[in-house]
Every structure is written in structure tokens, then in C-alpha cells.
Amino acid sequence: MPWGVTITNGRLRAVTRAASVLLALACAALLTQPALAANPPVSVTATARATVVAPLTLVWVQDLKFGRIVPRPQPGTVTVDQNTGACTVTGPILEVGKCQYARFAGMGTKNLSARITLISLTDLTGPGQTMVLDQIMLGTNSTISFVGNTNANGSGVGLTKGGNAERFTIITNSGIYLLNIGGRLNVNANQAAGVYNGSITITVQYQ
């Protein structure tokens, strides 16, 4: 056979033998690796937690009182301050006796917030013409802290419109809170003598 052909065949045989050796080494390396299916599973956990708080309660403590009013031929107003319980009179009418704000007391959980819904006005009825109680507002005290927007009366707290709701946070360690309410009574001209009564509705719920 020609010399060149013999050299070519020799090279082919050498390359074939080298490839066989590399293939054998690769197979041996694969056999020494642990099977992927044998790896252990990985697990993690999360904590499930729930906090149960005391339900909100609210009870009546005292009524809103405007004292004794002496009417005149012209109308006037008597306003009970929601923070102090003091009375302010406008017009020719006279007011005698002690005024007081309405007070409610409740219990909840410290640092939780609640929303208050308070009516804006109500009627006082009696033997004469109905008197309107308006500007019903919530006062400040040391058991609660108001959050959210301020209102239009300049005090920064309270409610000036029915349907609006103010939020407060209970800040006492015991969870006891107080809500004081004042308002303005519109006395008609020559209001008939007698006792006049109305009602104020307030609602609180956790937020």
C-alpha cells in the first residue's frame, strides 16, 4: 500500500483509541457522582398567629344638661362646652343652674383605634315649640387621642356634621375610655315652660 495511505490509517486508529479512552473516563466520572434524586428535601415553616382583643363596650354615664332657662320675646341659644361643661348664652334669654356635658364610658384595648359616629342635631320636645339641639361635638380628655383630620370648629377634635366619623386611639393601660359631648340648644322666643327632652346617639367600632 502507498506510504501516505498507511500513515493516514495510523492516525485514524490513534484518534479512535484516544476517543475511546476519553469516553471511558467520562463514564467513570459520572458513576462516581451521587444521584440527584437521592438529595434530601428542603423544608421551611411559617408561624400562624392571631391576636384576640377585648370587644368594645360603651355605657351611659350622665346626660347633657342646659340648666334652667328663662325665655324672652326674642330667641337665644345656650351652648354647653364639650370639654369643660360650662354654659355660654346668646340673646336675651337667661340661664340659671348648672350645665353639664353628656358622658359615656367604655372599655377596649390600649393602642387600638375606634371610629365614632355621632349625630349632628336632634330635637328636644316638650309642652311648647320644639327646640333644636345642634353643633353636637365630642370633647377631648386624657383617655383618648384623636387621629385623622381636624374639624371646622378650631379645636382640632370632635364632630361638626352628622355622618362624619372621627377616629380615636385608646391610650389608657386599662383600656377604659371616656367620651364627653356638648352642643348648642336653640331656644325659641317665648318658649313655653316645662321639661324638654331629646336623645343623642353615638356609635363606636374598631378600625
Task: Give, region by region, the residue ranges found by the protein language model.
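Sec/Tat signal peptide C-region and signal peptidase I cleavage site
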Residues: 31-37
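N-terminal secretory signal peptides that target proteins for export/translocation
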Residues: 1-15
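Bacterial N-terminal signal peptides
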Residues: 18-30
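Serine/threonine-rich, low-complexity intrinsically disordered segments
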Residues: 8-10, 18, 34, 152, ...
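Acidic, glycine-rich flexible loop segments
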Residues: 140-185
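N-terminal small/polar-rich segments of proteins
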Residues: 37-127, 167-207
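Short, surface-exposed beta-strand/strand-loop-strand elements in extracellular ectodomains
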Residues: 132-141
